[in-house]
Amino acid sequence: MLTESRRKQYVEVLATHYVDGEVRPRTIHIPLVGEFDIEEVKRVGLTKDHTTHEIAKQYTVVVKGKETHLFEDSGRWFVLMRT
C-alpha cells in the first residue's frame, strides 16, 4: 500500500478565544498558497505529532467542503502538506 508523503508546514491562523478557554480557528493562511476559511470544526482532540513525536492538539475542520486536519502545538499552528 502506498502512503502519501507529507511535510509539516507552519501556518497563520485567525482564531476566536472564548472566556471558557475554548479556541475556535476561523481562517488558515498558508504563505505563498493563500487564505482558507474554516467552514466547520468537527472534532478537537490530542494526537502524537508525526515529526516531533510530541503531543499536539488536532482540529478536524472542513475547508472548501473537504475534511482536513489542523494542528496546534505550544501556540504554533501547522498542517501536513503533500510533498
Which role fits each region the language model picked out?
Residues M1-T83:
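Cysteine-centric segments in proteins
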